Amino acid sequence: MLVKDNKNIDFGYKIVKKKDKQNLVNNVFNSVADKYDLMNDITSFGIHREWKNNLINWMAPQKNQKLADIAGGTGDIARKFLNNGGHSAYVIDINEEMIKSGKVNKKNLKNIEWLVASAEDIPIDDNTFERATMGFGLRNVTNRAQALKEVYRILKPGGRFICLEFSHVENELIEEIYNFWSFKCMPYIGEKVAGDRSAYTYLVESIRQFPTQPELSEMFSEAGFSRVKYRNLSNGIVSLHSGWKL
């Protein structure tokens, strides 16, 4: 990882001021919001849908449960939660363009609310939700420790949080292939489909800067979560991290 201090943080492979990172991330998602779901399908060969299904299957939604989908973007995970037995969902995202895109694509979905807000300062009362998720969003948060504490705060006692995030591949051969696809192909596709090569260069770089699976598990524990576990999917290309508020 790059060397950082109290005033600086990584933005991909660049070091930027902490106060500037959120605006830089917003610019990335403002640029690609209307093509975000399409690009997910193309760059993952549609496998991102199965990763999200794995999250929902591990969570096993119940009809009395309300979900907070933090950094929820266009609402894919919230939709799956509702379609698999959950009662209602809030999609919380700091980027208004992503929320707008989600509202258009999920306009016929009932029991869903949309909220523009930072994961580091969620304007929701303590002990509100039975379940919380974050899919491919924690990498983009400036203060990840604070975001995890906020998730813990808004969960009810007995509540559960599952985070789906790009992680670190453990097989050397798969890692070599994955690196070629990530660094050579994804930015090119981003340029041709979404009109923004730099956004997908940032995406690839931010994945490599993200904590390892054991490191993120430790962050969960430090935020207060109990029974912390993780599962690797696709040989560690992504992982699911689970923690409970007990």
What role is predicted for each listed range?
Residues 1-26:
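N-terminal auxiliary segments of SAM/dcSAM-dependent transferases
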Residues 24, 92-94, 164, 168-219, ...:
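C-terminal alpha-helical "lid/dimerization" subdomain adjacent to the S-adenosyl-L-methionine
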Residues 31, 35, 44-65, 80:
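Conserved alpha-helix/loop element of class I SAM-dependent methyltransferases that forms part
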Residues 36, 132-133:
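Hydrophobic beta-strand segment of the Class I
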Residues 66-121:
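Class I SAM-dependent methyltransferase SAM/SAH-binding core
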Residues 120-131:
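A short acidic, Gly/Pro-enriched loop at the edge of an enzyme's catalytic core
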Residues 145-160:
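A short glycine-rich, Lys/Arg-flanked "PGG" loop and its adjoining helix->strand segment in the class I
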Residues 217, 223-246:
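Core SAM-dependent methyltransferase catalytic element
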